[in-house]
C-alpha cells in the first residue's frame, strides 16, 4: 500500500470496509517479517501471552481487537493492559490527551451497518492512575488458569492463534517449537499479502485475516472450556464469561 489511511482522506464506507483491515494486515506482515509479534516465541519457545482488558466490559478483548492492540502496545512501549473508548474514558474521570490516536477497529451494529471506533491505553489519558484504578474495579476476568501450561501443537493459523488467545484470556503459560512458529508464519503470510491487494484483485480462495481472527477467537473459547473441565474450574463461572462475551466476540472486523 502506498497510501497512509490515517493521512489520506477517504469516504467513511471505504475507511471502514477497506483501510482498517488492510492496515491490520500490514501491521501483522511487518511484525512477522521482523519476527516481532505478540504471538511469536523467543529463542526458547516461550510466548508472553498477556490479556488486554476492555475497561467498559471488564473482559479481555476478542481476537480481532486484542492482537492489533497488542501490536500497538509493543510499538509504543505501554505498560498498562487496560483500554477503553473515548467516551468510556470520560466516565472514568479523565480524558484522552490531545493528539493521541487510538487503535481503530470495525464492528457491525444490529442492522448490519459497519462502524468504526477506537481504543486508548491508560498512558494516553490525562490521568492514567485514576483511569487504571477505576477501570480495574470493573475487570471480571482474572488469571483463573494460572499454573496451567500449554504447548501449541499446530501451525494452522486458527489453531495456533486460538491457543495463544486462550492463554491470554485464561492467564496460563504457552510455548511453541520455534520451527512450528515459522511454519505458522509461512501459512498465514499468503492471507496477509492477499489482504493488502486492491479489493478486486484479492483471491477469494484465501480467508481474510478478519475471518482467521474470528475463527481463532471461537477456537480459544473451545480450548478454555476444555481446560476448565479437565482442571475442575468452576463451570458456572466459565459459562457466565462465555455468555457475557458472546456479543463482543461476534463483532467481526471487516
Residue positions per predicted region:
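N-terminal accessory/interface modules of nucleic-acid-binding and processing proteins
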Residues: 1-253
Amino acid at each position: 500500500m502506498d497510501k497512509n489511511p490515517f493521512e489520506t482522506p477517504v469516504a467513511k464506507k471505504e475507511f471502514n470496509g477497506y483501510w482498517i483491515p488492510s492496515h491490520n494486515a500490514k501491521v501483522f506482515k511487518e511484525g512477522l517479517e521482523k519476527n516481532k509479534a505478540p504471538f511469536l516465541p523467543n529463542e526458547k519457545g516461550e510466548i508472553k501471552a498477556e490479556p488486554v482488558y476492555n475497561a467498559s466490559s471488564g473482559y479481555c478483548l476478542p481476537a480481532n481487537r486484542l492482537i492489533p492492540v497488542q501490536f500497538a502496545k509493543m510499538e509504543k512501549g505501554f505498560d498498562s493492559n487496560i483500554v477503553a473508548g473515548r467516551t468510556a474514558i470520560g466516565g472514568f474521570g479523565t480524558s484522552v490527551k490531545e493528539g493521541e490516536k487510538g487503535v481503530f477497529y470495525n464492528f457491525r451494529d444490529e442492522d448490519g451497518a459497519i462502524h468504526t471506533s477506537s481504543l486508548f491505553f491508560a498512558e494516553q489519558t490525562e490521568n492514567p492512575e485514576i483511569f487504571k484504578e477505576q477501570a480495574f474495579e470493573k475487570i471480571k476476568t482474572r488469571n483463573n488458569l494460572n499454573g496451567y501450561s500449554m504447548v501449541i501443537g499446530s501451525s494452522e493459523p486458527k489453531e495456533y492463534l486460538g491457543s495463544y488467545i486462550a492463554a491470554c484470556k485464561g492467564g496460563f503459560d504457552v510455548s511453541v517449537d520455534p520451527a512450528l512458529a515459522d511454519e505458522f508464519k509461512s501459512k498465514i503470510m499468503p492471507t496477509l499479502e492477499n489482504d493488502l491487494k486492491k479489493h478486486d484483485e484479492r483471491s477469494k480462495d484465501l480467508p481474510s485475516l478478519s475471518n482467521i481472527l474470528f475463527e481463532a477467537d471461537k477456537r480459544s473459547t473451545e480450548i478454555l472450556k476444555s481446560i476448565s473441565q479437565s482442571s475442575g474450574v468452576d463451570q458456572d463461572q466459565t459459562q457466565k464469561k462465555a455468555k457475557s462475551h458472546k456479543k463482543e466476540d461476534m463483532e467481526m472486523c471487516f
